A protein has these predicted regions:
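Active-site mouth loops of central-metabolism enzymes
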Residues: 3-17, 69-83, 115-123
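Active-site beta-loop-alpha junctions enriched in small/polar residues
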Residues: 8-10, 36-40, 64-67, 106-108, ...
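Acidic-and-aromatic substrate-binding clefts and catalytic sites of carbohydrate-active enzymes
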Residues: 11-16, 35-47, 70-72, 111-113
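Short, acidic/polar
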Residues: 12-25, 47, 78-91
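Catalytic domains of carbohydrate-active enzymes, especially glycoside hydrolases
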Residues: 19-41, 89, 95-100
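Aromatic-lined substrate-binding rim segments of carbohydrate-active enzymes
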Residues: 44-56, 64
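Active-site acidic/histidine proton-transfer and metal-coordination neighborhood
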Residues: 53-54, 76-150
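Non-cysteine beta-strand/loop elements that form the S-adenosyl-L-methionine
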Residues: 58-65, 102-104
Length: 150
């Protein structure tokens, strides 16, 4: 078993540099750190990958979708925005040399504007959108998981 911790345990905002906290996690004995992709840049992702390699600590990645990127939406443009956001997240996960991407990715983060209505349509839209990223996940050898909101 690998015991890890989410870098959000330490940060004050999603865009904060996670590298200092990766050091803290290693020092505390963790073997893995989950890093939010929100606010990450490709150059920052490369630095995180190098640091993780130097410290012999694994990285997993997490992200979320905005209302404008809601893959469960009935609006095709919004769905496509979400697919593109997930593709960027997959690329960033790969840059960090991580093998797992998770988060609230079946829909937009937060409470749905439909307040529980149209769940079957939302499920179909989400599923259809996720199918569009499976080949990229496979190509990059990244596992994908969803954290459903409560």
């Amino acid at each position: 078993m690998i015991l890890g911790v989410h870098s959000a345990t330490f940060v004050k905002n999603w865009h904060e540099d996670a590298k200092p906290y990766i050091y803290l996690c290693k020092k505390a004995g963790y073997k893995s750190v989950e890093v939010s992709l929100l606010g990450q840049t490709p150059s920052g992702a490369k630095e995180i990958a190098k640091l993780a390699n130097d410290l012999n600590i694994s990285i997993t990645c997490t992200t979320g979708l905005s209302n404008e990127e809601d893959i469960s939406s009935s609006d095709p443009v919004t769905q496509q925005n979400g697919v593109e956001a997930l593709k960027r997240a997959i690329d960033m996960t790969s840059i960090m040399q991580a093998k797992l991407l998770t988060g609230v990715v079946h829909a937009a983060w937060g409470i749905s504007n439909s307040m529980g209505k149209d769940k079957e349509d939302k499920f179909k839209n989400s599923s259809h959108s996720i199918k569009k990223i499976t080949s990229l996940l496979s190509e990059k050898n990244i596992k994908f998981g969803d954290r459903a909101t409560q």
